[in-house]
C-alpha cells in the first residue's frame, strides 16, 4: 500500500535531515518572489498578480526562494520538475532539454500569462499540457481545453498558487513509474498530494504555513474518503493506468 503523508513544517529543515536521493522525483512550486508592492505572484491560479484572498488570515510570504533550497532539492531527489523554473535560471544553474509548458487555454483579451513553465531534469522533448484555468473557467475532465459547464464540479480555490489536480495527474502519468517516491516541498493546496493518492504513488509533502496546511488536510480528507469508498474498483483502474505507461 502506498504512503501519503504531509507535514506542517519548513521544507528546508526537513531536507537537511534527509539522506541523498531519498526521493525518485520532486515536483515543486517554490516561491517566485514579490513582483509588485502589496501583491503576490499567482502563478498557480491566474498567472498574474492579485490581492491576498480575504478568507486567508496568514500573510503570503514574498521572499524569492534562494540557491540553498535548490542545492538541497537536487541532493535529496533523483529527478526534479520545478514550476516557475524560468524565474530561477540563476539559482538552478543547470540546463534542461525538457521543459513542461502548461497552456491555460485563456480566451483572447485575458491580461494574465497564457502559460506557465516548469524546468525538468529529464532528457526528453519539451511537453505541453493544455488545461483551462482562469477563475471560474476550468477545464473538463478528459478534455481540459473545453470549459466545465457545471461550476459546482470546479476545484475550490484554497491557495493563491493553486494548480489543478489534472496537471499533477498528467505529470505523474508521464514522468513516474510504479514504486516511485514523490516529494513536494511547497504543498500549498494539496493538488499534488491528491493526484498521487489517486494513482497509488508514495508521496511526502511539506507546507510551513499552518492555515494552508489545515486547508489542504481538509481537502485531502474529503477526497481520500471518496476514493476509499470505491477502493476495489480504483485498484483495478490504477493497475490499468500504469500498465499503459
Can you name each region flagged by the protein language model?
Residues 1-4, 114:
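Sequence-level motif detector for i,i+2 pairs with an aromatic at +2
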Residues 3-13, 229-231:
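Conserved SAM-binding strand-loop segment of SAM-dependent methyltransferases
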Residues 8, 12, 66-70, 165-169:
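Short, well-ordered alpha-helical scaffold segments within catalytic/effector domains
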Residues 9-12, 57, 116:
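Generic secondary-structure boundary/loop-capping signal
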Residues 10-13, 63, 85-87:
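Short beta->alpha connector loops
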Residues 17-28, 32-55, 74-245:
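Class I S-adenosyl-L-methionine
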Residues 52-64:
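A short acidic, glycine-rich active-site loop
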Residues 63-79:
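A short glycine-rich, Lys/Arg-flanked "PGG" loop and its adjoining helix->strand segment in the class I
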Amino acid at each position: 500500500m502506498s504512503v501519503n503523508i504531509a507535514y506542517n513544517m519548513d521544507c528546508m529543515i526537513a531536507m537537511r535531515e534527509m539522506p541523498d536521493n531519498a526521493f525518485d522525483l520532486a515536483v515543486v512550486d517554490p516561491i517566485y518572489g514579490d513582483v509588485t508592492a502589496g501583491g503576490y505572484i499567482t502563478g498557480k491560479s491566474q498567472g498574474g498578480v492579485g490581492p491576498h484572498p480575504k478568507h486567508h488570515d496568514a500573510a503570503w510570504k514574498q521572499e524569492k526562494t534562494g540557491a540553498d533550497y535548490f542545492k538541497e532539492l537536487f541532493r535529496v531527489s533523483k529527478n526534479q520538475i520545478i514550476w516557475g523554473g524560468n524565474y530561477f535560471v540563476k539559482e538552478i544553474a543547470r540546463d534542461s532539454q525538457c521543459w513542461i509548458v502548461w497552456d491555460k487555454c485563456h480566451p483572447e483579451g485575458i491580461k494574465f500569462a497564457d502559460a506557465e513553465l516548469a524546468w525538468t531534469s529529464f532528457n526528453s522533448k519539451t511537453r505541453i499540457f493544455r488545461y483551462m484555468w482562469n477563475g471560474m473557467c476550468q477545464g473538463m475532465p478528459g478534455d481540459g481545453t473545453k470549459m466545465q459547464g457545471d461550476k459546482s464540479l470546479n476545484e475550490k480555490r484554497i491557495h493563491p498558487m493553486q494548480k489543478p489536480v489534472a496537471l499533477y495527474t498528467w505529470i505523474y502519468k508521464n514522468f513516474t513509474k510504479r514504486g516511485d517516491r514523490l516529494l513536494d516541498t511547497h504543498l500549498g493546496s494539496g493538488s499534488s498530494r491528491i493526484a498521487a493518492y489517486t494513482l497509488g504513488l508514495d508521496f511526502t509533502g511539506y507546507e510551513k504555513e499552518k492555515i494552508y496546511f489545515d486547508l489542504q488536510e481538509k481537502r485531502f480528507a474529503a477526497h481520500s474518503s471518496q476514493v476509499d469508498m470505491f477502493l476495489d474498483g480504483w485498484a483495478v483502474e490504477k493497475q490499468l493506468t500504469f500498465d499503459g505507461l
